Curated annotation (Swiss-Prot):
Biased composition (Acidic residues): 8-17, 386-410
GO cellular component annotations of the record: nucleus
Compositional bias per record (Basic residues), positions renumbered to this chain: 283-296
Organism domain of life: Eukaryota
Region (Disordered): 1-49, 99-307, 319-353, 382-419
Native organism: Dictyostelium discoideum
Listed name of the protein: Putative uncharacterized protein DDB_G0289963
Listed Low complexity bias regions: 18-44, 99-115, 167-178, 186-222, 297-307, 319-330
InterPro entries per record: PRCC
Length: 527
């Protein structure tokens, strides 16, 4: 194999590189010039597009100046006109009022004014006011049915029933006479210029393509870097927003916990004052029921800390456990955080129940060394409280000792019921019967007294069985009335026995006079 050695000249390579760079620079300059020419041509084309003319009704209107027309049904124009007329009317009325006040002041100052001129001025001002009122009435009628003037030949117009378009509220009708019409422009010069520029552009397109390939490679690298930067910025922004939200939530939670603690402390103080006060049992229970309950504090964070501390106390598994046949790892029992919270809740409930039992406790608590401040409490709302809680009141009134709570009272009641036996019951009734017999022996029997009569009737009819009829029931129920009738008859007989003897004629006169007297008294009463 034959090897050939080739020697390169460094100077020839440098010259070739310089020539290539110069050519590239020249091409770039040409591209800039061509781009400027293209921009100028595009601007000229835009101006030409603006000056495209539409020939309608022998008039020339440029599209750039024409405003969009909207068809309105007569409401919008009349509403705008009405606003203008209202402002004019207000101005005219202000002028009239000012002139009238000025005229009155002149009358007070100048006593020698002519009455004829005054009458003329007042007449003219009244006519103006009447004309304004008539115009207002016409405008109202036009506003209600705006197509009165431009009404079609048909029996009724449906245009007034159509709703107004939303876009028509901000638009107004246009008139052709208000536009300034431009003059036409020769398009021949523009066409020649465009042809020359197009030729120059075609010559320079080849140079542009070569440069674009180099630029695309550079742009691709730059775009990748920019995308990475944008992603990192977005991630940082999202993290910042999340951190801000977390901080705000933590602040709100702390504030809520502080408020709940303050409320709970206040409620506990009031409960202690009520229990230590000399309030009766039924009213005291109502006060305690109507007070708000203690709010439980959220202990989510504390439970997590307790679990971490307990896990550290786990002992490693010894070899003795592995020697046994048990394959499972016998780990010690780990207490759960929720169990501690349950224990605390149960303790709080027990404390509340203990506080409920404190009736008339005058001893001060050991923790509070200070004397309790006595506050005035309005009991009117609780005394005249007709909330329909009658059942609770009845249950409370049944308790003989209001100072005892319900649980203790029920226990004592059950004990009393269990203590009574049949022998004790018989002794109790035997003693009562002896007392009644002693009373009967001491007191003589009188039919006039209702109690003795009923007792006598029951005592004599203890073991007897007899048929019950309606007549007997009525007699038994009306026994007291029968006794009263007997009293009256006996008294009348005694009175008649003591009265001196009188002839029949005198008796009749006496009865007639008494009847007339009764009639007159009744007559006056009704009148």
């Amino acid at each position: 194999m034959s090897s050939f050695l080739v020697a390169y000249d460094d100077e020839s390579e440098e010259e070739d590189n310089n020539n290539n760079n110069n050519n590239n620079n020249n091409n770039n300059n040409n591209n800039i010039i061509n781009n400027n020419n293209n921009n100028n041509n595009s601007n000229n084309q835009i101006k030409d597009e603006d000056n495209i003319y539409s020939y309608n009704n022998d008039t020339i209107i440029s599209q750039s100046q024409v405003q969009p027309k909207t068809v309105t049904l007569g409401l919008n124009n009349k509403l705008n006109q009405k606003k203008i007329q209202q402002t004019q009317q207000i101005q005219e009325k202000d002028k009239l009022s000012s002139d009238f006040n000025f005229y009155n002041n002149n009358n007070n100052s100048n006593s020698n004014s002519n009455n004829d001129e005054n009458d003329d001025f007042i007449y003219n001002s009244n006519n103006k006011k009447r004309n304004n009122i008539d115009n207002d009435a016409e405008e109202i009628n036009e506003f209600r049915n705006p197509d009165l003037k431009n009404k079609p030949k048909s029996s009724h117009s449906l245009f007034s029933m159509l709703p107004t378009p939303k876009s028509s509220q901000n638009t107004t009708t246009t008139q052709q006479s208000s536009y300034s019409f431009p003059k036409p422009v020769n398009n021949n010069n523009n066409n020649n210029n465009n042809n020359n520029n197009n030729n120059n552009n075609n010559n320079n397109n080849n140079n542009n393509n070569n440069n674009n390939n180099n630029n695309n490679n550079n742009n691709s690298n730059n775009n990748d870097d920019e995308k990475d930067d944008d992603k990192s910025k977005k991630i940082n922004e999202n993290e910042n927003t999340v951190n801000k939200k977390d901080n705000i939530e933590n602040q709100n939670e702390n504030q809520n916990e502080i408020e709940n603690e303050n409320e709970n402390n206040n409620n506990e103080d009031t409960k202690k004052k009520i229990n230590n006060s000399m309030i009766p049992g039924s009213l005291r229970k109502k006060l305690l029921k109507n007070q708000p309950k203690t709010k439980k504090s959220t202990t989510t964070t504390t439970t997590a800390t307790t679990t971490t501390t307990t896990i550290t106390s786990v002992k490693p598994i010894t070899t003795e456990i592995n020697n046994n046949n048990s394959n499972s790892n016998n780990l010690p029992s780990i207490p759960i955080g929720n169990e501690k919270s349950k224990i605390n809740d149960n303790q709080d409930e027990e404390d509340e129940n203990e506080n409920d039992g404190l009736f008339f406790s005058f001893q001060q608590s050991s923790t509070n060394n200070k004397k309790p401040q006595q506050e005035e409490i309005d009991y009117s709302a609780y005394i005249n409280n007709d909330d329909g809680d009658d059942d609770d009141d009845d249950d409370e009134n049944e308790n003989e000792n209001d100072s005892q709570p319900e649980e203790e009272y029920e226990e004592n009641k059950q004990q009393q019921q269990q203590e009574w036996t049949q022998e004790q019951i018989q002794q109790y009734w035997y003693m009562q019967q002896q007392e009644q017999q002693q009373q009967q022996q001491q007191q003589p029997f009188n039919l006039k007294s209702q109690q003795q009569y009923q007792h006598y009737h029951e005592y004599n009819n203890v073991g007897k069985i007899y048929e019950v009829n309606q007549s007997k029931m009525l007699e038994e129920n009306n026994s007291f009335k029968i006794l009263e009738l007997r009293k009256t008859t006996q008294e009348q007989d005694r009175v008649l026995a003591n009265i001196p003897k009188v002839s029949k004629s005198q008796r009749q006169k006496h009865t007639i006079g008494s009847l007339l007297g009764d009639y007159q008294t009744k007559k006056y009463k009704f009148e």
